[in-house]
Amino acid sequence: MGFGQANTSILSQLAAAGSVKRVFAHCLDNVNGGGIFAVGEVESPVVKTTPLVPNQVHYNVILKGIDVDGDPVDLPPSIASFGGNGGTIIDSGTTLAYLPANLYNSLLKKITTRQPVKLHMVQETFACFSFTLNTDKAFPVVNLHFEDNLKMSVYPHDYLFSLRKDLYCFGWQSGGLTNQDGSDVILLGDLVLSNKLVVYDLDNEVVGWAEHNCSSSIKVKDGSGAVFSVEANNLIASSSSSSSSLLLHFHISWRRSRGKQTCKEWTTSAYL
């Protein structure tokens, strides 16, 4: 979509023109569908942040730990020690979450120890099981801990998806991804980012998130200082300003199907 960190990205070009700050946010709703994408400084809700690793092509962050309902999961040495390239990437263009094989195995073992199930592979990719009870009540919460005490909680309805009635699969994947130096890489996609407002602040070199109802709205400030209410379906000015700046708003409509989020519709609004 052209919202990377490069100077040639859409966001960087808008910022260079003085239209907006280099800040954007998205909120993906995997419960009701839909969501929000906005360019501009987020006024509310308040979002805690963690530093971005500098001089990276991707949105790399420092993962400090993982726990399953408070029970720590051992991180691979190359992730825990943090190499120069940054071992964890935030990527909304990726559907699932990809972990080094040893971390993937440890995480699933912790989860299935708390809620025993008989796993079998589907499509040679997904670890699946039969289950008739409420998964949110039966399965544990996975917590990811990042630098500057930022936590991301991933709930069962986030990391599990249903192939059909009473058949569920884990969205966690054994990725086998590595940096050029051979160190392990964790790739966190929409599996963990959904149902959260995620803010990318390139001016301050941070990324952050807060749990949020992605079918509701957020408050965004444009380059002129005007504050707008950005809703999942429309854009309404909440301050009487005839701003000459630009505020972009994307309405996102998407669905989860067999472990894949599919973009169904994009609409954009621009205020000049």
Give each language-model segment a name:
Residues 244-251, 267:
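Cleavable N-terminal signal peptides of Sec/SRP-targeted secreted and luminal proteins
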Residues 2:
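C-terminal reverse transcriptase regions that engage the nucleic-acid substrate
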Residues 5-239, 250-254, 272:
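C-terminal catalytic lobe of pepsin-like aspartyl proteases
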